[in-house]
């Protein structure tokens, strides 16, 4: 067993070396586009750009974190944030009895007709989004009886730092977390979605919001995405999703993933230095006090 684990880790290490080289080349080609990311006019453009900056930075502790086992070179360029791709989602029409939804689907979901399906299916089936990379392996993992694969894809998305969570291009307040048949941070960490976890984020959200109502000072310190909506087919980890809706009051905000703070800029500075210069008049001490407060 130990030899098998070592062989798996060696394979992961080889993948990490290969992917690191590809991502380094992507950084050399595209980094200048991100040098003025804080000047982008829309909050979502700033967020997705900072996510992309963070994607070029290796994990601080896990030596082979760069490996996305299950992504070949083509898939990496099509679906990883380092390459800033844009793609459409695939869709399944599942029998209503086979799919559990935590709430009504978002209004911007595509129609059955748009997906090339008969409109009459709307009464008997419900749509479930699928990542294009997972789409290719669906039969291998199984589908509920009566499931129909939509002939057309729909909804343009861009990958965030987490890779399996994507931002809806035309509705950037909406992010969708999707299962991916890819392993990261170890051969056993397959990036699927356990159905029971669909409800964890919403529970945490409502708990924090309840605390905020009791403590106004606490409530002024954070905003929380709405994670009420999600769906899953029975206990199938490859047939699930979580929809996250960002608050509407983000128009002038700049959201900064912590993972992006130490990202290098083309001019040699760290991103946190640019951030401090823009919002704290260059005072790292003031920024640090705010960050730790």
Where are these regions (language model features)?
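Noncatalytic N-terminal accessory/assembly modules of large enzymes
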Residues: 1-129
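Conserved ATP-binding subdomain of kinase catalytic cores across diverse folds
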Residues: 89, 96-291
């Amino acid at each position: 067993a130990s030899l098998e684990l070592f062989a798996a880790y060696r394979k992961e290490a080889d993948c990490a070396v290969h992917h690191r080289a590809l991502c380094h080349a992507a950084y050399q080609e595209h980094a200048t586009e991100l040098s003025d990311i804080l000047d982008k006019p829309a909050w979502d453009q700033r967020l997705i750009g900072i996510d992309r900056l963070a994607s070029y930075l290796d994990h601080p502790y896990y030596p082979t974190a760069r490996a996305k086992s299950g992504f070949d070179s083509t898939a990496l360029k099509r679906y990883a944030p380092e390459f800033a791709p844009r793609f459409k989602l695939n869709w399944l029409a599942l029998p209503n009895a086979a799919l559990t939804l935590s709430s009504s689907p978002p209004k911007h979901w595509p129609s059955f007709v748009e997906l090339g399906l008969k409109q009459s299916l709307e009464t008997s089936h419900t749509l479930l989004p699928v990542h294009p990379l997972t789409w290719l392996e669906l039969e291998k993992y199984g589908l509920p009886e009566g499931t129909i694969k939509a002939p057309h894809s729909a909804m343009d998305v861009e990958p965030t730092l987490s890779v399996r969570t994507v931002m809806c291009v035309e509705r950037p307040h909406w992010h969708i977390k999707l299962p991916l048949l890819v392993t990261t941070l170890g051969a056993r960490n397959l990036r699927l979605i356990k159905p029971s976890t669909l409800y964890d984020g919403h529970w945490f959200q409502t708990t924090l919001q309840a605390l905020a109502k009791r403590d106004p000072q606490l409530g002024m310190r954070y905003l929380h995405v709405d994670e009420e909506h999600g769906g899953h087919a029975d206990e199938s980890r490859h047939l699930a999703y979580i929809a996250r809706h960002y608050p509407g009051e983000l128009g002038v905000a700049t959201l900064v993933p912590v993972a992006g703070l130490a990202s290098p800029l083309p001019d040699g500075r760290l991103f946190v230095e640019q951030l401090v210069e823009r919002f704290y008049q260059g005072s790292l001490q003031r920024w640090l006090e705010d960050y730790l407060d």
